[in-house]
């Protein structure tokens, strides 16, 4: 069974980026090579600060969308609670 992840990275400017990946470590490396999202491309390096694992892509994408609606403060609380 495949694993699906929602992750948050902290960018060099202190901002937070939320994304989805099947392989979080490879995705973070991709962000740091400038091959990830446009948002992170100009905010490198990024550091993984949070991740959640799901059994299905659908669950992970729903959670990614939910987290993307959070305020910065709510994301920081989520990171701190883990």
Swiss-Prot record:
CDD domains: GIY-YIG_UPF0213
Record-linked InterPro entries: GIY-YIG_endonuc, GIY-YIG_endonuc_sf, UPF0213_domain
Residue stretches making up the GIY-YIG domain: 2-77
SUPFAM superfamilies with a match to the protein in the record: GIY-YIG endonuclease (SSF82771)
Pfam families reported in the protein's UniProt record: GIY-YIG
Family designation: Belongs to the UPF0213 family.
Protein name: UPF0213 protein SAOUHSC_00458
Originating organism: Staphylococcus aureus (strain NCTC 8325 / PS 47)
Species lineage: Bacteria, Bacillati, Bacillota, Bacilli, Bacillales
């Amino acid at each position: 069974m495949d694993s699906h992840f929602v992750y948050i990275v902290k960018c060099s400017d202190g901002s937070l980026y939320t994304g989805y990946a099947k392989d979080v470590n490879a995705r973070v490396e991709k962000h740091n090579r400038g091959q990830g999202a446009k948002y992170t491309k100009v905010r490198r390096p990024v550091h993984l600060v949070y991740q959640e694992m799901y059994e299905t892509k659908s669950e992970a994408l729903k959670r990614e969308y939910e987290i993307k609606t959070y305020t910065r403060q709510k994301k920081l609380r989520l990171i701190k609670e883990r």
